[in-house]
Regions:
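Conserved N-terminal phosphate-binding loop of PLP-dependent enzymes in the Aspartate aminotransferase
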Residues: 1-426
Length: 426
């Protein structure tokens, strides 16, 4: 019997069966068929325990939600203490928690940012960003990159790959245009007519497998947006909050975006909260009609408490130093592993602890993912480029755990290569 206080289950098998009945049959079956029949029970730091008792090192982190680890003690303490004063709050009125977080976000953001609008999920924050761009420019078209992913809400999903954008028959698809990543000429062509409200890009596109921007590419895109009166929207949901060794990855490029979107890790992994950080131009609607976007749970006060503590931890000098230290360990270790498998392990895409590992097979990352799972590590393939494994170490990993992960990865890469080469031979 598994007793969780307000509910119980007899077994893992019962959970899987009822998940297919009452929750999501296709996704549950997909993971079972893939060999990852994971039902998370206990979780602590950078470890997960399956209901069967097996421990996994978490290198997925739910897209960076658990940058600081699962159930981070400092974040939990902040929320516990916050519950003495706060709850969700009332979204209509000024709030000490929302105001304190908004001020801190503006203080830590690029100089262009002056206001904050809150959401409860990343897609909602993206929707706020796109609506803000449309209001500011009085234009409707939005440009994103091919293989983009910015969430699953109404406007956000329309910016993404057709797999998701067309699934629910997205409205007015002609208003959402896509160009290849790192193709500056294509970006110039699509913006030249002067009818685009905003360009939205992840600074390093996560679901596309973390391809790195070519030198000067993002800077050139920003210059083109300024030339044509288009807003530049930096989606930092997965690349922000110190994952690249800077609080916001976009600042490494010297870019001051018109809008910056943050989420996932902002929650400390404990209470949902996201935000669209707006420049004066993008925030005009807040002066004209502050009821233009209403979100009951956007900027929930307990979420603000969690986010403030998360920002405080993430901006500590020792955490910044730790990220660079961890990145160096993995840089050296990954190169050693790649040298042993040069025809199989063909690419390392790394900026800080934002890492993608590329393999020589159309779905190579799925094979490595499965072998890693069997060897006690959870990392996920890139949905829109399954050649690439998303490999996302936490910000506070110990050297010992880094080396443990590298040892397990070396075994998994070798085993996956044997499986794939064996299939090709047969």
């Amino acid at each position: 019997m598994y007793d969780y206080g307000t509910f119980t289950f007899e077994s893992k098998a019962e959970v899987l069966d009822k998940a297919k009945t009452f929750w999501n049959p296709d996704k549950t079956q997909f993971w079972t068929d893939t060999g990852v029949d994971l039902v998370i029970d206990r979780r602590e730091g950078y470890f997960l325990w399956d209901m069967g008792g097996r421990r996994l090192i978490d290198l997925h982190l739910n897209g960076g939600t658990y940058n600081l680890g699962h159930r981070n003690p400092e974040v939990m303490q902040a929320i516990t203490e916050g519950m003495e004063h706060f709850d969700v709050g009332n979204h209509h009125f000024p709030s000490v928690a929302r105001t304190a977080l908004a001020q801190r976000l503006v203080e830590t953001a690029p100089a262009s940012i002056t206001k904050v609008a809150y959401g409860s999920g990343g897609g909602e924050a993206i929707d706020i960003a796109l609506k803000s761009a449309r209001h500011a420019t009085k234009r409707r078209k939005i440009v994103s990159i091919v293989k983009a992913y910015h969430g699953h809400t109404g406007l956000a999903v329309a910016t993404g790959d057709d797999r998701f954008a067309k699934f629910f028959l997205a409205d007015q698809p002609d208003e959402f245009l896509q160009v290849p990543f790192n193709d500056i000429e294509a970006m110039e062509r699509v913006l030249a007519p002067g009818d685009v409200a905003g360009v939205i890009m992840e600074t390093i596109p996560a679901t596309y497998g973390f391809p790195l921007p070519a030198p000067g590419y993002l800077e050139a895109v920003k210059a083109i947006t300024e030339k044509h009166g288009t807003l530049y929207i930096a989606d930092e949901v997965q690349t922000g909050l110190m994952r690249t060794g800077e609080l916001w990855c976009i600042t490494k490029h010297g870019i001051e975006p018109d809008i910056l979107v943050t989420g996932k890790g902002l929650s400390g992994g404990m209470y949902p909260i996201t935000a669209a950080l707006l420049s004066d131009r993008a925030a005009k609607w807040l002066d004209e009609d502050g009821f233009g976007h209403i979100s009951t749970f956007g900027g929930a006060e307990l979420g603000c408490v969690a986010a403030l503590k998360t920002l405080e931890i993430s901006t500590r000098p020792e955490v910044r130093s730790m990220v660079h230290y961890i990145a160096d360990i993995f840089d050296q270790g990954l190169q050693r592993i790649q040298a042993d498998h040069p025809d199989w392990f063909v690419g390392i895409r790394q900026n800080g602890v934002v890492i993608g590992l590329e393999f020589d097979h159309p779905e190579g990352a799925k094979f490595v993912m499965r072998e890693l799972y069997e060897n006690g590590v959870w990392a996920i393939f890139s949905t829109l480029d399954p050649r690439v494994l998303q490999f996302k170490p936490g910000l506070l990993l110990s050297r010992e755990l880094c080396e443990d992960v590298l040892d397990r990865l070396a075994v998994a890469v070798a085993r996956a290569e044997t499986v794939v080469r064996g299939r090709k031979a047969s």
